[in-house]
A protein has these predicted regions:
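All-alpha prenyltransferase/terpene-synthase fold signal
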Residues: 1-179
C-alpha cells in the first residue's frame, strides 16, 4: 500500500545517507551535496508528473525536463558519485553525469514505448498501464501535438474516460491513435 511504500522509501533514503557518511572525509561534502540535490530533484520531477495528470497541454520540453528530474538525475548522480570517490578529474565526473542523464532519458523514452508496444512477458508488466492511468508520456504528448481535430477529440475523450470496465478498449483505441 501507499503508506508502506512511503515508509520504505524514507528508510532507504536514511540508509543511503548512512552509507554515504562512510566516504572519505575529503570527498564527503561534495558527495552529500550532490546526493541531496538529486533527492530534491527527484521529488520535483515526481511533483511535475502528478501535476501533468491534470493537464492536456503538456509540452514535449516540459515532459523531457520532468523525466530528467524524475529518472535521469538518479543515474547521473550514481555515475558522478562513483567518479568522485574514484578520484576522477572534475571534467570526467561531469561528463559521466551528463552521460547518465542521457541514458536515463533514453531509458524512460524506451519505457514509454514499451508500455504501448512491448511484450508483457519480456517487459515485466502489463502493456497499456500508462494509457489506462492517463500518464502524460512521450507517446501521448506527441500524439496530441500531431493529431488532427477529430483525433484530438477522440484522444481527449479517452483521457476523460475513467471507467475501469472500458480499460482494455481504451488501451486499444489510444494505441490505434498512436499508430
Amino acid at each position: 500500500n501507499a503508506n508502506t511504500a512511503i515508509l520504505s522509501g524514507d528508510s532507504m533514503l536514511v540508509f543511503a545517507y548512512k552509507l554515504l557518511a562512510e566516504c572519505n572525509v575529503d570527498k564527503l561534502k561534495e558527495v552529500l551535496d550532490l546526493f541531496t540535490i538529486t533527492a530534491l530533484e527527484i521529488g520535483e520531477g515526481q511533483q511535475y508528473d502528478m501535476d501533468f495528470e491534470l493537464r492536456n497541454d503538456v509540452a514535449e520540453s516540459e515532459y523531457i525536463e520532468m523525466i530528467r528530474l524524475k529518472t535521469s538525475v538518479l543515474l547521473a548522480c550514481s555515475m558522478k558519485i562513483g567518479a568522485i570517490l574514484a578520484g576522477a578529474p572534475s571534467e570526467d565526473a561531469n561528463n559521466l553525469y551528463r552521460f547518465g542523464e542521457l541514458i536515463g532519458l533514453a531509458f524512460q523514452l524506451q519505457d514509454d514505448y514499451l508500455d504501448v508496444y512491448g511484450d508483457s512477458k519480456v517487459f515485466g508488466k502489463a502493456i497499456g498501464g500508462d494509457i489506462a492511468s492517463n500518464k502524460k508520456t512521450f507517446m501521448l504528448i506527441n500524439a496530441l501535438s500531431k493529431a488532427n481535430e477529430t483525433q484530438r477529440k477522440e484522444l481527449e475523450m479517452w483521457i476523460a474516460n475513467t471507467n475501469v470496465e472500458d480499460e482494455q478498449k481504451k488501451i486499444e483505441a489510444v494505441t490505434a491513435l498512436y499508430n
